[in-house]
From Swiss-Prot:
Protein family: Belongs to the OMP decarboxylase family. Type 2 subfamily.
UniProt protein name: Orotidine 5'-phosphate decarboxylase
HAMAP family from the UniProt entry: OMPdecase_type2
CDD domains hit by this protein: OMP_decarboxylase_like
EC top class, as a word: lyase
PANTHER family according to UniProt: OROTIDINE 5'-PHOSPHATE DECARBOXYLASE
Chain ranges passing through the membrane: none
A single GO BP: 'de novo' UMP biosynthetic process
Origin: domain of life: Bacteria
Coiled coil: none
Catalytic activity: orotidine 5'-phosphate + H(+) = UMP + CO2
UniProt lineage: Bacteria, Pseudomonadati, Spirochaetota, Spirochaetia, Leptospirales
One Pfam family recorded for the sequence: OMPdecase
Alphabetical keyword list: Decarboxylase, Lyase, Pyrimidine biosynthesis
Length: 275
C-alpha cells in the first residue's frame, strides 16, 4: 500500500528543514474557545484552521485529538475530517498524527485502520499496546504510515500500571512494551514517552536511538524544554497543545498562538545542532 511519502521521510524532511522538533497539538476544548469562535457554525474547524495557519511556519507536525471532536457526535466527526482536509490540502508537507489511542480486537482494529489510514490518510496514529500484537497488525499493513504505541505517558497516575515490574523478567510494563516492539522488529512504530519522566526518557532514547518518540507533557503539563532537549534526540516530536493554542482566549488567539509557536521554535533551533 505504498505510493506516498512515508511518515519517517516526511518527518525527517520537515524536522531538518526547520531545525526543530515542535509538534503542535490541536485540542479544541469548546469551553475554552474564544467567544468569537464559539459563535461560528463550525467552531472547531474555525479554531483549528486559524491555529494551523498561524503556526504552520513552525510546526514539524500537527496532532489533532479526536476526543474534542467526538463529543459533538456526527457534527464533530465532520469537523475533524474538515480539519484533516485543511491540513492535507494546504500543508501536505506537514505530517499529521491523529491522537486517537485506539486498541481493540483484530477485526475492529482493521476498521479503524481503514478509516484513518485508508480513508482519511493521516500519517500516523496513537495506539494502545495492551491488547497485544494482533491488535496492531491491521495498522502495520499500511507500510507508509507510522503508529505510536503508548509507552510511558505523561499523566500523573501513569505509574500505577506502566511502572509496575514483572517478577519473571524484571522489566516494567512500559519496558515490556518496548521489548516486544523490538523483539518482533516492527519498523514503522514509535513510542509515546511523556516529557514528565525525563530520566526514563533519556534511558529509552539511549536504548532506542532510531525510534521516533512522540513526547507530550511539555508546557501546560509542567515539563521544561531545557530539560527535554538534551535527552530526547533528533528522532522526537515534542508536543505542545494548550500552551500554544490557548495562549490567548481573545480575538487575538491565532496571533498569540503563532507567537508562542515561534518562541518555542527558536528555542529548539538553538539546541538542534547539538542533538
Amino acid at each position: 500500500m505504498g505510493g506516498k511519502m512515508n511518515f519517517q521521510s516526511k518527518f525527517l524532511t520537515r524536522s531538518q528543514s526547520l531545525k526543530s522538533l515542535l509538534c503542535v497539538g490541536l485540542d479544541p476544548d469548546f469551553d475554552k474557545l474564544p467567544e468569537i469562535v464559539k459563535r461560528s457554525p463550525e467552531p472547531l474547524v474555525q479554531f483549528c484552521k486559524e491555529i494551523i495557519d498561524a503556526t504552520a511556519s513552525y510546526a514539524v507536525a500537527y496532532k489533532p485529538n479526536i476526543a474534542f471532536f467526538e463529543v459533538f457526535g456526527s457534527s464533530g466527526i465532520r469537523q475533524f475530517e474538515k480539519v484533516i482536509g485543511h491540513l492535507k490540502s494546504n500543508y501536505p508537507q506537514i505530517p499529521i498524527v491523529a491522537d486517537v489511542k485506539r486498541g481493540d480486537l483484530d477485526n475492529t482494529a482493521r476498521q479503524y485502520a481503514k478509516y484513518y489510514f485508508g480513508d482519511l490518510q493521516v500519517d500516523s496514529l496513537t495506539l494502545s499496546p495492551y491488547m497485544g500484537l494482533d491488535s496492531i497488525r491491521p495498522f502495520l499493513e499500511y507500510q507508509d504510515y507510522l503508529i505510536f504505541w503508548l509507552c510511558l505517558t505523561s499523566n500523573p497516575d501513569s505509574a500505577q500500571f506502566q511502572k509496575k515490574r514483572f517478577s519473571e523478567t524484571g522489566r516494567t510494563l512500559y519496558e515490556e512494551v518496548v521489548y516486544v516492539a523490538n523483539l518482533v522488529a516492527i519498523s514503522n512504530l514509535g513510542f509515546v514517552v511523556g516529557a514528565t519522566s525525563p530520566s526514563e526518557l533519556e534511558t529509552l532514547r539511549t536504548q532506542n536511538p532510531n525510534r521516533i518518540f512522540l513526547i507530550p507533557g511539555f508546557g501546560a503539563q509542567g515539563a521544561k524544554l531545557e530539560n527535554l532537549l538534551p535527552v530526547c534526540g533528533r528522532n522526537s516530536l515534542i508536543n505542545s497543545s494548550r500552551g500554544i493554542h490557548f495562549a490567548s482566549n481573545g480575538s487575538d488567539f491565532a496571533v498569540r498562538a503563532g507567537q508562542e509557536a515561534e518562541k518555542i521554535h527558536k528555542m529548539m533551533q538553538t539546541h538542534f545542532i547539538g542533538l
